[in-house]
């Protein structure tokens, strides 16, 4: 049974593939979801191979980007950053009941290391002890996001 956060993630990915054209080749309906737990990417264009990350958050006002959004695993993100590889970000903001949503886009070339803040590793008593995630400090790039829908 998926958690509320997992359901929100699927919701965000579904909205991106339903509504967004590929930012690289500009074709409609070519973005498809990648398998769950694919590292650092959630969608791929089945025409040109473009990869993108999707993050979703519940907010009170879908017109305002929150100051921070939960990311994913820190280690693979850090390894890619060290290699100067960044994936474009689709940020899906949804109302509490998911009736309203907005999709924002942040291009890879507008991302800087300051956008990513590592979280503290999970405690030794946690189910996934030692796992470390990160937070997108969206305040660092607020003016670079473009609203698509």
Predicted features along the sequence, with ranges:
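Nucleic-acid endonuclease domains
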Residues: 1-51, 55-149
